[in-house]
Amino acid sequence: MEKTEEEVEMKELVGLVRILVKRGIDLARRDALSSDPFVVITMGPQKLKSFTVKNNCNPEWNEELTLAIEDPNEPVKLMVYDKDTFTADDKMGDAQIDMKPFLDVHKLGLKELPHGKELKRIVPTRDNCLSEDSIIVSDNGKIVQDMILLLKNVECGKVEIQLEWLKNPGGSGL
């Protein structure tokens, strides 16, 4: 089956999103006393990994990972693992990052907004992994979204992240 022009265009680089993986909150223990957590973020074939924090169920990563957005409808998945030396890494939960509200606000092309201006508020639902309200705001000329994701497929744990759209001179934009 031949691809339409629209489908071919979707594979062009739309832009870049920086995901600041801030911290883990009350992550599950997978070793005797603690865990050695790290985060993996995937979108299509892209796979990004944070560094490992040793012996900590409340790790501070503060690590920036950058995804190239080719298809805005492609799901972004976040997985947390416990690093093990001699056996396979243990799963510590996962979440899906709903990029749609963030990308929709960016499409509006808002410029020169006052610092801290609330642009959109997203409430937790059964369809997203939000632990609490997530607010998209202007931040010194940038649009950012802070969110705390409730991990699924695990007994406890949350991960705090921040999304930021990065300017891409060669991208087609949204």
UniProtKB/Swiss-Prot annotation:
Residues binding Ca(2+) 1: 30-31, 82, 84, 90
Gene Ontology biological-process entries: abscisic acid-activated signaling pathway; gravitropism; phototropism; positive regulation of abscisic acid-activated signaling pathway; positive regulation of GTPase activity; response to blue light
Keyword entries, A-Z: Abscisic acid signaling pathway, Calcium, Cell membrane, Developmental protein, GTPase activation, Lipid-binding, Membrane, Metal-binding, Nucleus
Domain of life: Eukaryota
GO CC terms: nucleus; plasma membrane
Coiled-coil ranges (or none): none
Location relative to the cell: Cell membrane; Nucleus
Main localisation: membrane
GO MF term (any one): metal ion binding
Record keyword Transmembrane helix present: no
SUPFAM superfamilies: C2 domain (Calcium/lipid-binding domain, CaLB)
Phenotype upon gene inactivation: Increased sensitivity to blue light leading to an enhanced phototropic bending and a faster response to gravitropic stimulus.
Residues annotated to bind Ca(2+) 2: 31, 36, 82-84
Function: Stimulates the GTPase/ATPase activities of Obg-like ATPases. Mediates the transient calcium-dependent interaction of PYR/PYL/RCAR abscisic acid (ABA) receptors with the plasma membrane and thus regulates ABA sensitivity. Prevents hypocotyl bending as well as gravitropic response under blue light conditions.
Subunit structure as annotated in this protein's UniProt entry: Binds to PYR/PYL/RCAR abscisic acid intracellular receptors in an ABA-independent manner, both at the plasma membrane and in the nucleus. Subunit of a complex made of CAR6, PHOT1 and RPT3/NPH3. Interacts directly with RPT3/NPH3.
Family note: Belongs to the plant CAR protein family.
Protein name: Protein C2-DOMAIN ABA-RELATED 6
Organism listed in the record: Arabidopsis thaliana
